[in-house]
Structures are given as structure tokens and as C-alpha cells.
Amino acid sequence: MIILPIAKILQGIILAADHEVIVQGWVRTRRDSKAGISFLSIYDGSCLDSLQVIINHDLPNYKSDVLHLTTGCSVVITGSIVTSIGVGQHFEIQAKNIKVLGWVKNPETYPITAKKHSLEFLREVAHLRPRTNIIGAVTRVRHTLAQAIHRFMHIEGFFWVSTPLITTFNCEGAGEMFRVSTLDLENLPYTSKGKINYEKDFFGKEAFLTVSGQLNGESYACALSKIYTFGPTFRAENSNTSRHLAEFWMVEPEVAFANLTDIAILAEKMLKYIFNAILIERVDDINFFAEQINKNIIKRLEQFISSNFAQIDYTEAIDILQNCKQKFDHTVFWGMDLFAEHERYLADKHFQAPVVVTNYPKDIKAFYMRINDDGKTVAAMDVLAPGIGEIIGGSQREERLAKLDQRLADRGLNIEDYWWYRDLRSYGTVPHSGFGLGLERLMIYITGMHNIRDVIPFPRNPRQASF
């Protein structure tokens, strides 16, 4: 006797009628007929669809157990796979034995009933929302997306590097970082100047949750040539919107001996590979999102895969935006950072294709980006996708120590805090480039979901860390 996931049964793994199998899962619905037969719809999360189980009244525990099953009860069923005569699926289980592992104590108050719930409500019961079709589908797509990224990187010769989550420096040069401390908040030590004495803290200095694994990744790229980081990052940005999370996952490839053009080509190749993997490996889930969330997502992904990326300079992008007939909420001028409305116009309307925008003004970009020969711009790029805007941001890194020191000084950053990062430029420095890809932002693009909190298992945002 073997245990089969529902996905395998529905794919058509047929066994002889007298060969019993075991199916484990949770009850979605129960329907009873006057003929003394009950029909259970059960799911186990292995696929979108539920499996129908036919239970005859002659089972010993039919009256004591089966007729009391409600949504959410967990069961183990032994039976035979048979061809279904009903509409909707090809196979079902003829039960020979059913064991109830867990009852729903109060079906009247069980939050995840068979009816459809709003996504807002489901966020309030985040520990139970994986039991719904929509969050189950999100989770399977997210898994396949992560696997496709790892697979692509492996094929391309990249090594995965696990970078630290606790750091003592600021990669982006911004102030929105979570502090990590073991100091007694009710009895803080102070210096003679009245400042918190972090020498008494666990690490002997200020420590934070990382905003990026990039700087650490550069260290390994300058030894292994091609690496990537893949893990959680944190931003203490007090922004309570559908586009922001305090904790999110980033993929950050870093390539030695590569310039901006090289990394733009890599970004295009990676995106097309993983989108194609999703369309092939998660057919049912993607069709579900197309039916329930956004009917255009399959066409959008297919067009993305078949498109030739447009590539323009930032200055050219500003010219296009200033001369178009579109009215924007934010005035367009050289030196500004592009807003979502500008990115969407370029990708959706002007080019009607993915766009790579390069060479941004240095004053709006991070200190580690390589200064161009004009002294005003840096070798940075953003990949803009139709329907969403920016999905990748990257750059060629500044490999010249003197230039890097000047950039740190211009940003008011203490160069001693970055001593080891600067040290990389003193021993066999090489041109190198990389980019960052937010996993949750990519999930929104793939699934059509509207709120970023619905594509991560337990979202963290201002005043929300309950689960």
C-alpha cells in the first residue's frame, strides 16, 4: 500500500482496482445523498484541485464519523483509484476505510469556510490562509519561482553564497534600517557625550538587519567570478502601502569581469527563463490566477518572453517623457528619479515591451555605482516591465578605490565603516557588476495579485508582526 499525493492521482497514475492506496488531506466539502453515499472533496496542497472521495454507508464509522465531517477536518483515507463518471475530474477514490485525525472543534467559528473570503480578511488569519485555493496557488508558484531561479543560476555557472542578515554597515546609504541590539532598553548605557554607548552592546558597535547582501556578495564574486545571494532583506520604511514590505526576499547576482551591458543581458535571460518555467510547470495555478485575478497574465508573460528588450539612456527617457502627450502627477526633469507612472508609460505605451534604462544621475543612485566618464552619471540600470514598472535594479560597481572613497565622502558616509569593502579594490581589483531582483515584486507580476502582502507567507509591515 502506498501513499499518493492528490496531484499524482489526478495526473493519471492508475493502479489496479484491487490495489489500495492511501490519501491524506483536509476536507473541503461534504455532500450526502439519500442513497446513503457521501461525497468528500479533500485537498492536500500538492495541486490546485481537490479530489472526490466516495464513501458508502456500510463503512463502520460512517454514522459516527463521516456524517460529522466539516470543512477543515483532517483525514486519512484508504481506497482504490477509480475512473470518475462525473464532470470535472477523471479520477476519484472509492473509500474502504477512513480515519479522522483532527476535528474542527467549532465549525461555526472556523474562519476558512468553503465560501470565498476577501484577501483583507485572510491577512487577519494568516496562519490559516494557506488552506485557501488562492494562497495555496501563490505558495506553489513562489516555490517554483525560487526553484527556477536556483536552477538558472546553476546552469549559468553561478555559486550561491549565503550572506549575513546582521550587519554593521549600510549598503544603500539610507537611514531606514532595523537596529539589532541586546542592550537593556530600560537601562541604556551612555557615553560622556550623552550618546548610547554601543561598545557595551553584543557586537561592540551599532548593528542592523541587512538591506542587501550585495556588498558581501561582491567579496565572493571577486574570488569565484559568478555568485548570487538569495535571502531576506529588511527596510524600516514606515510605509503602509500595497507595494511595501519591511521584510522581503532578494536575488542578487554578482559577476566579476562584467560591465553594465553584460549584466543587462543576464537579467533579460534570467527573467525569460523563469517566466517560461512558471508557464510550463504551474499550468493549473497560472490558469487559476488568469480566471480569478487578471485575465491578461498569461498573455503578458508570453509577450515578455518573446519580446526584444528596448534599451535607452536615462537622458533619452527624460526626453521621451517630457515630449509625450501624457499628463503625469510628477513633473519630469533631468535629475529626478523616475516614478512608477513614468516607468509604466515607457514600458506600456511608448515601447510596449520591457525596457532597460541606463546611466542615471549619480546624485540619485547609491555610492557603489561606477561613475561614468561624464562625471554626472553612473553605470546603473533598471529593467522596466509592462504592467508594473521596475522589477530589476543593477549597476556596474565602482572598482577604483579613489573614486569609491570620493563617493563615500560625497554621501557623508564614514569610509572606515567600509574598510573591508574598500580593501577589495587594493588587491587585484576588477570590473564587476550585479543587480537585485525582489522576489515578491516578481510574484505580483506573475500572479496578477494586487497587494504585496498576499504573495509572502507572513508579511511584515508597520505595526504588523503578529504571526
Curated annotation (Swiss-Prot):
NCBIfam families linked: asnS, PRK03932.1
The organism's place on the tree of life at top rank: Bacteria
Gene: asnS
Top-level enzyme category: ligase
Protein family membership: Belongs to the class-II aminoacyl-tRNA synthetase family.
Self-association and partners: Homodimer.
EC number per UniProt: 6.1.1.22
Protein name in UniProt: Asparagine--tRNA ligase
Key words of the record: Aminoacyl-tRNA synthetase, ATP-binding, Cytoplasm, Ligase, Nucleotide-binding, Protein biosynthesis
GO cellular component: cytoplasm
GO biological process assignments: asparaginyl-tRNA aminoacylation
